[in-house]
């Protein structure tokens, strides 16, 4: 078999990037140098892989789920000592032997595994990552990026935006039309760069966990006012004290609360509950 005879598998969510301008843009925003150890998720036919290997990098390790592509990729890059390939599902692949060496992660993410991919590589509130990723460059569904970057009082505001913005710096580079892929997906994509915050730049872990707790209970009932949501974890007296401490309008709905106010709300909850 060769690449021409290989057909994309729908079950793997394969939409291969064929727009050379976007391939070059990914390489550009990665800001690669000779110290970089790249993890590429889902190299496909190796179009982006080729451009990355042409850069001054230390190494590129690719993880590909499709077994039919393994021999083809190994053959294509057999003369490049910087290249290594692993067959497997990135959601369950063991990367322990190289994880501390990886500096940048680059991927055209299958839409059906976006959530788990974000949890693994960007991280979660209340969990300190042992990874050393400087940049994570993802090509992902535009609607998801809209949600991640949304601000309070917007239609896309939600728990995901607060969580992602608290643990990483995020920048949308450009939107990418369906015609840039083969086969074209039904929706637009966005090229986005995440820079995970170092542990010393993160909030206190206990505070992060409480924020996460508040986000979960609040956005599960996003039409309810915060006052009514807090009834499930605080007494009426505690809610009154919290209103004084946090200076937040408790008639607000969760999507109308800014990130800074979520922090104040969690700090107030911790202070009140620790006194009792």
Curated annotation (Swiss-Prot):
GO terms for cellular component: cytosol. It catalyses: adenosine(1518)/adenosine(1519) in 16S rRNA + 4 S-adenosyl-L-methionine = N(6)-dimethyladenosine(1518)/N(6)-dimethyladenosine(1519) in 16S rRNA + 4 S-adenosyl-L-homocysteine + 4 H(+). The keyword Cytoplasm applies. One of its GO terms (molecular function) is 16S rRNA (adenine(1518)-N(6)/adenine(1519)-N(6))-dimethyltransferase activity. It comes from Prochlorococcus marinus (strain MIT 9515). Belongs to the class I-like SAM-binding methyltransferase superfamily. rRNA adenine N(6)-methyltransferase family. RsmA subfamily. Gene3D superfamilies: Ribosomal RNA adenine dimethylase-like, domain 2, Vaccinia Virus protein VP39. S-adenosyl-L-methionine binds at residues 15, 17, 42, 64, 89, 108. This is Ribosomal RNA small subunit methyltransferase A. Specifically dimethylates two adjacent adenosines (A1518 and A1519) in the loop of a conserved hairpin near the 3'-end of 16S rRNA in the 30S particle. May play a critical role in biogenesis of 30S subunits. It is found in: Cytoplasm. Keywords: Cytoplasm, Methyltransferase, RNA-binding, rRNA processing, S-adenosyl-L-methionine, Transferase.
């Amino acid at each position: 078999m060769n690449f021409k005879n290989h057909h994309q598998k729908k079950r793997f969510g394969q939409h291969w990037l064929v727009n050379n301008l976007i391939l070059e843009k990914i390489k550009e925003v990665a800001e690669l140098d000779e110290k970089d150890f790249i993890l590429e998720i889902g190299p496909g036919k190796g179009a982006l892989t080729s451009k990355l290997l042409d850069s001054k990098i230390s190494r590129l390790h690719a993880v590909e789920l499709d077994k039919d592509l393994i021999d083809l990729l190994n053959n294509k890059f057999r003369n490049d000592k910087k290249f290594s390939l692993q067959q497997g599902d990135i959601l369950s692949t063991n990367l322990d032997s190289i994880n501390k060496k990886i500096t940048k992660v680059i991927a055209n993410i299958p839409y059906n595994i976006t959530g788990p991919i974000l949890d693994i590589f960007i991280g979660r509130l209340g969990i300190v990552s042992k990874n050393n990723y400087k940049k994570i460059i993802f090509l992902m569904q535009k609607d998801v990026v809209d949600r991640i970057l949304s601000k309070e009082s917007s239609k896309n505001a939600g728990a995901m935006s607060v969580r992602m913005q608290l643990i990483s710096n995020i920048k949308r580079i450009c939107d990418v039309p369906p015609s840039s892929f083969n086969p074209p997906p039904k929706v637009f994509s966005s090229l986005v760069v995440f820079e995970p915050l170092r542990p010393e730049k993160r909030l206190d872990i206990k505070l992060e966990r409480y924020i996460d707790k508040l986000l979960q209970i609040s956005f599960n009932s996003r039409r309810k006012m915060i006052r009514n949501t807090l009834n499930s974890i605080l007494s009426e007296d505690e809610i009154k004290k919290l209103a004084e401490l946090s200076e937040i309008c408790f008639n607000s709905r969760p999507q109308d609360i800014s990130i800074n106010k979520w922090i104040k709300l969690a700090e107030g909850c911790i202070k009140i509950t620790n006194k009792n």
